[in-house]
């Protein structure tokens, strides 16, 4: 489903058994590269000794895989402070339907195949700019549909700190319909020094 509803005939791939490793943690840069079947709590347990965590804190963190969270553009209770998945994914390595493995990331670093995809999507964004401006939901936690506004941000929060384009953000929220993820490069955050619970 593209918006969270049930699906009819579909292919569901469970990566959580064989495709769940932490491939790299760069403490200095505050990044981690992971396979899509890794469960969020398992990642955060490995990051805790480094004083880091992945701040997209969904309530199902004991079961939620990073690939599934990316596919859904998951948020979490602290998304107002940290953003949702699209704000915390720096890159993705993914297979296209042709079987070609492509690196998705900052536009300035794209290889020829990814640059061609970026050019095509940018053309769509320009062609439909008026419709995007008129109809794109102006909400902080938009989690449904393709992020066609990566070239002309319509989100209240910029996708990147410097406003640059990151093609990996096109895959976030696409629920695997554009490519099949091999790995994700994630932006980490320092562990909070204190936590507060407010009850209304």
Label the model's feature ranges:
Residues 1-19, 34, 55:
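Glycine-rich N-terminal segment of FAD-binding domains in flavoprotein oxidoreductases
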Residues 21-25, 31-200:
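FAD-binding subdomain of flavoenzyme oxidoreductases
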